[in-house]
Amino acid sequence: MKGFGLAFGLFSAVGFLLWTPLTGLKTLHLGSCVITANLQAIQKEFSEIRDSVQAEDTNIDIRILRTTESLKDIKSLDRCCFLRHLVRFYLDRVFKVYQTPDHHTLRKISSLANSFLIIKKDLSVCHSHMACHCGEEAMEKYNQILSHFIELELQAAVVKALGELGILLRWMEEML
């Protein structure tokens, strides 16, 4: 009976290891917090709406997230906190508020929001275990993002932030 249990356990472990890459789950290293996220699925959902959302953006001289380079400045220790704030920002101020008559786009945004909810849950666990440090620089950078968002009229800001989601996703990819 022990042999069966050992074989089953070994089979399960190998199955899990083989299955994980197929599902697109990636491990993100955020300082002392480590989470998994299906970045491949999030990228796919975003890529299906990116062009149409970016075409709505008429404020080409203003950036909310700036560039992936500016996000790279976030210290490793502060990444969990910074990402936690950005995930909440996208859930509360972007996905929830975005308006379009296009049902396909709304479905994709709903799917993106669901993926972000999973990330938020995992980041909350890190936060509750005190593994999500919030340094002054990370909070400054997040407040700059909020400031750029608030500069615009609400719907224009939402469109801008949604169109720039790729910047955040590329930054997350770099934490693998």
UniProtKB/Swiss-Prot annotation:
Cellular compartments annotated = Secreted
Q: Which positions make up the signal peptide?
A: 1-24
* GO cellular component terms, semicolon-separated: extracellular space
Read off the Gene3D superfamilies from this record: 1.20.1250.10
Q: Which Pfam families match?
A: IL10 (PF00726)
InterPro entries cross-referenced by the UniProt entry: 4_helix_cytokine-like_core (IPR009079), IL-10/19/20/24/26 (IPR020443), IL-10_CS (IPR020423), IL-20 (IPR020442)
GO terms in the biological process aspect are: hemopoiesis; osteoclast differentiation; positive regulation of osteoclast differentiation
Key words of the record: Cytokine, Disulfide bond, Secreted, Signal
Q: Give the disulfide map.
A: C33-C126, C80-C132, C81-C134
Mention one GO molecular function.
Answer: cytokine activity
Q: What family does the database annotate?
A: Belongs to the IL-10 family.
| Assembly | Forms a 1:1:1 heterotrimeric complex with its primary high-affinity heterodimeric receptor IL20RA/IL20RB.
What is the stated purpose of this protein?
Pro-inflammatory and angiogenic cytokine mainly secreted by monocytes and skin keratinocytes that plays crucial roles in immune responses, regulation of inflammatory responses, hemopoiesis, as well as epidermal cell and keratinocyte differentiation. Enhances tissue remodeling and wound-healing activities and restores the homeostasis of epithelial layers during infection and inflammatory responses to maintain tissue integrity. Affects multiple actin-mediated functions in activated neutrophils leading to inhibition of phagocytosis, granule exocytosis, and migration.
Q: Which PANTHER family does the record associate with it?
A: INTERLEUKIN-19-RELATED, INTERLEUKIN-20
What name does this protein carry?
A: Interleukin-20
